[in-house]
């Protein structure tokens, strides 16, 4: 039962709080900033093509750095502030670490999944979902869950897309936290998280 309260206390520290809201807004602004660098290309694009190519942009990784900063670096922050001592007096290290792993995953998952989904939906105000004359659309629908796009189920497709991106963010944020147990410098911890992202992408490719 004590473990449940520790997890709950950590959860209430980030869910709906200032850092989470700022992170959500940062994801929206960041993604718009990246795609609007080529304003002419943006106007002539469509949502499906834009999101597909956007993942190849090197600045895409900043999304993962933003979400990892919510709980992925919490150990470093609590060691610096002395809050770690407060926790250890109330639970053992195993429960502390387990709670942080759970919250590192779900904070990053919820933040990036919701942020990306809202960003993609907002693109619909300015862009069409697809270009029927584009050969690239045929390439995209041959990939995972492409049948949803082919049948016009765009919202369903991007719900699953954002769930996948969110899970990747959760895993990387958890990895960032684990690294922070051994590396005390917060900046170095974040850099390691970025390296994990590139290794993950390279492995998947």
PLM feature spans:
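Central hydrophobic cores of alpha-helical transmembrane segments
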Residues: 23-30, 186-200
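Hydrophobic core positions of alpha-helical segments in small-molecule transporters
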Residues: 22-26, 98-99, 107, 111, ...
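Aromatic- and glycine-rich beta-strand/loop motifs that create alpha-glucan
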Residues: 1-24
């Amino acid at each position: 039962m004590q473990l449940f309260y520790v997890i709950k206390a950590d959860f209430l520290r980030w869910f709906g709080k200032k850092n989470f809201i700022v992170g959500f807004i940062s994801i929206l602004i960041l993604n718009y900033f990246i795609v609007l660098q080529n304003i002419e290309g943006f106007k002539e694009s469509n949502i499906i093509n834009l999101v597909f190519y956007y993942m190849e942009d090197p600045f895409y990784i900043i999304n993962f750095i933003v979400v990892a900063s919510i709980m992925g670096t919490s150990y470093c922050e609590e060691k610096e502030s002395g809050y770690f001592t407060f926790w250890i007096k109330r639970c053992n290290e195993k429960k502390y670490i387990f709670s942080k792993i759970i919250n590192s995953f779900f904070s990053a998952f919820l933040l990036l999944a919701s942020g990306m989904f809202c960003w993609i939906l907002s693109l619909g105000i300015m862009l069409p979902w697809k270009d029927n004359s584009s050969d690239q659309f045929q390439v995209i629908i041959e990939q995972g869950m492409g049948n949803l796009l082919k049948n016009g189920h765009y919202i369903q497709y991007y719900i699953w897309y954002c769930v996948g991106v969110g899970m990747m963010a959760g895993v990387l944020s958890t990895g960032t936290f684990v690294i922070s147990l051994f590396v005390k410098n917060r900046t170095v911890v974040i850099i390691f998280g970025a390296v994990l992202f590139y290794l993950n992408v390279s492995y998947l490719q």
